[in-house]
Amino acid sequence: MGEHNLLNPGFVGPLVNIHTGDTFYFPNFRASGAQLPGLPSLSYPRRDNVCSLPWPSAEPCNGYPQPYLGSPVSLNPPFGRTCELARVEDSKGYYREPCAEGGGGGLKREERGREPGAGPGAALLQLEPSGPPALGFKYDYTASGGGGDGSTGPPHDPPSCQSLESDSSSSLLNEGNKSASAGDPGSLVSPLNPGGGLSASGAPWYPIHSRSRKKRKPYSKLQLAELEGEFLVNEFITRQRRRELSDRLNLSDQQVKIWFQNRRMKKKRLLLREQALSFF
């Protein structure tokens, strides 16, 4: 039997929670690791290139991202790219180095904005995703210059609302000037000046919604004589008498009613004027 000490596998196994079915004892080996004189010593040549690395040992090579150092390189790059940078959270202070294929596409947005001479056009060029077109990126301003055939064109910014408004107003003004200079007979006519065209202050595209005033139609002498005679008989005409007058004088019922109202007001003004003159 072997020596009973703490280095014996029979005692060490249960202590480290390793249960083995069979326990082997080697009486020729001691606990100190020294061999007996009867066993021959085996020599193994040392090989330095067993665990040699393909890169220099001075460069750090680890698979975990280190803060404020170079980013890790994935061993299996997707989509056939030569260099794929791992995505890290923005809350951590990791800086990613530019990729060889993307042309600086891996830089952070803050670092792009700090570069000298970076304008709105440059920001659009830099923010373009460097992935393949099959992924279907939403915003691609650099390749939107051409049509649907995939031809590339110069980058351009989308037009703003102010530019659209200015273009529309200028086009309307130009059309109005052309129509005014040509003297189109079908143009809008002002109700105040039917014979002439538009006024200088009027806009050609602005529709005139003002209601034209109805032309005044004066009463004839025969109608006035009949109405005056009826007023002398009765200032307040009845409905039946009003209908008879309207039918006989070829007037509407409303016209007869309004004429009697105006005639009563005229009589009242004359009475007030006579009273005012009598005091002096």
UniProtKB/Swiss-Prot annotation:
Keyword annotations of the record: Developmental protein, DNA-binding, Homeobox, Nucleus, Transcription, Transcription regulation
Pfam family membership, one: Homeodomain
Stretches for region Disordered: 95-212
Major subcellular site: nucleus
GO MF entries: DNA-binding transcription factor activity, RNA polymerase II-specific; sequence-specific double-stranded DNA binding
Keyword Nucleus applies: yes
Membrane-crossing segments per the record: none
Residue pairs linked by disulfide bridges in the UniProt entry: none
Keyword Nuclease included in the entry's annotation: no
SUPFAM superfamilies noted in UniProt: Homeodomain-like
DNA-binding region, residues: 212-271
GO cellular component labels: nucleus
Superkingdom: Eukaryota
Skewed-composition ranges (Low complexity): 159-173
Record localization: Nucleus
Function (record text): Sequence-specific transcription factor which is part of a developmental regulatory system that provides cells with specific positional identities on the anterior-posterior axis.
Annotated family: Belongs to the Abd-B homeobox family.
UniProt name for this protein: Homeobox protein Hox-C12
Gene of this entry: Hoxc12
